[in-house]
Amino acid sequence: MSTEEVPVLIVGGGLTGLSAALFLSQHGVSCRLVEKHRGTTVLTRASGISSRTMELLRGVGLERTVIERGPKLVEGARWRELGQPADQIPWVVIRANGLHDLENAVTVEEPSLDVGHLSPTRPYWCGQDRLEPILRDEAVRRGARIDFNTRMEAFTADESGVTATIVDQATGEQSTVRARYLIAADGVRSPVRETLGITRTGHGTIGNAMSVLFKADLRDTVKGRRFVICYLPNPDEPGVLQLPEVPAVLQLFDEDRWIFGFFFDPRETSPEQFTDERCAQIIRTATGLPGLPVEVQMARPWEMSHNSARSYRSGRVFLAGDAAHVHPPAGAFGANGGIQDAHNLAWKLAAVLKGTAGDALLDTYEQERLPIGAAVADQAWIRHTWRLNDSEELRRALRESTLVATGYRYTSDAVLGAAYPEPIPAAHDLTGRPGYRVPHVWLGRGGERVSTVDLGGDAFVVLAGPDGGEWQAAADKVAQDLGVPVHCHPVGGDGQLTDPDGAFLGTTGLTRNGALLIRPDGFVAWRAEYLPEDAAGELRSALERILARTSGTPGGTALEG
């Protein structure tokens, strides 16, 4: 049996795995993905795409494609102000006694989606069944090999790589793949995680649920009271748990398709007992619309849980997405977190594989993403509990949605001059501090608008003030000496980037000759308040530390808090 060699093997072809293949390909890294299912999902989950995830998709040229596949998410008040446009969805969560009584519905959550000052893009609504093919096609176009109906039967890992047994499920043929690294994006139950013996912490299983995708014309019923989620009383049906604190949930999927969810006790009722007709009747009862024509398109059982892996790395193997963290769907954080895991890991693997970074850079994947994954899981748990049982204690623990999605921060060896007590701050602080994503400022280039967020992608970026032209020579020298792509962009002055609104220095807090060092994933790695005497030496020292090449000590300003 021949052995195929590949730099990175990805197990799991959901949103996280496909994103990993795409982002690795963006950085020029060959990879192979194997997925046991026959194709991308037909299940309708993970519809809400955060502005941060949209930024990542924008970075690989997919923003317009996603926008064309789904409606824009807007604030409820804004939607009403605009006359309730059909091509927009208000992000509103309500609780009602039935769809026949929406005029008395109570608004549970109506978060602000005003991210124009934070991001060059915004949240959109695009279900997993539509997003996965988009990611797959772009990853393949960029050179990734993606094999569905193919599973990893077993693997062994050693100090130099991973050896995996791969099975083509259509033919039964076995083959061997030798990879430098393995990304386990193989879901909640993650055989890879279990094989490695990585344990998890959290609340564990919350309950067994049934999700029913159905088609029904509810346009007139919900007219003027549109929502993304509506909590309804559980119908008095055999097998449906009658717990007042756990209601049924109705969620919009698209114009005339909806997802209805309820909990059941598997000790008393098996999933097979929920036939299409029975599910349709449960939906009619819960909505209070006994004559509603319902076409059940799919019903699937699933387990709601709250768990975070205690480690994201074991030698040459990395956990990502649901394999690393899983939580209730409240907040729409799950898929976004998995895509962001993949984005964080991809540039680091690329740097190590290309020989421009030391292996210790890969340790920063866990240093950065594990605290975020655990904190986001906790925020989803808090939201889930708060929506069902409001309390002042839960309100105090709750973080605003855009803060969880965009405002988080990293503390790691790849962030210099800053350390933070927790990954999600109490308020937005996108001001150019190390560990945060670069603040969004609209700049001008060649007569067009470009965001500071758009300037990275496949290289480090030095973003300097208008009198920081000398950073260009420093960046060029360091790039040549280290063999690392470093682009320099003085903003204003004689540079190609203009600051038409005069917002750059005020937003970043830089002096006119200071600079930010931005990582390929868009996060600030280091900042210099002023141009140092030896700009090239300071920049080189910073990059060597970030890339785990030496223990040099760069200048810059230390930040805490």
Swiss-Prot record:
FAD binds at L15, E35, Q128, M152, D322. Disulfide bonds: none annotated. Its cofactor is FAD. Gene3D superfamilies: 3.40.30.120, D-Amino Acid Oxidase, subunit A, domain 2, FAD/NAD(P)-binding domain. Its EC number is 1.14.13.200. GO terms for biological process: antibiotic biosynthetic process. The active site is at Y231. GO terms for molecular function: dioxygenase activity; FAD binding; oxidoreductase activity, acting on paired donors, with incorporation or reduction of molecular oxygen, NAD(P)H as one donor, and incorporation of one atom of oxygen. Optimum pH is 9.0-9.5. Signal peptide: none annotated. Keywords: Antibiotic biosynthesis, Dioxygenase, FAD, Flavoprotein, Monooxygenase, Oxidoreductase. Pfam families: FAD_binding_3, Rng_hyd_C. PANTHER family: BINDING MONOOXYGENASE, PUTATIVE (JCVI)-RELATED (PTHR43004:SF19), TRK SYSTEM POTASSIUM UPTAKE PROTEIN (PTHR43004). Belongs to the PheA/TfdB FAD monooxygenase family. Involved in the biosynthesis of tetracenomycin C (TCM C). Can use either NADH or NADPH as electron donors, but prefers NADPH under physiological conditions. This is Tetracenomycin A2 monooxygenase-dioxygenase. The lineage of its organism: Bacteria, Bacillati, Actinomycetota, Actinomycetes, Kitasatosporales.
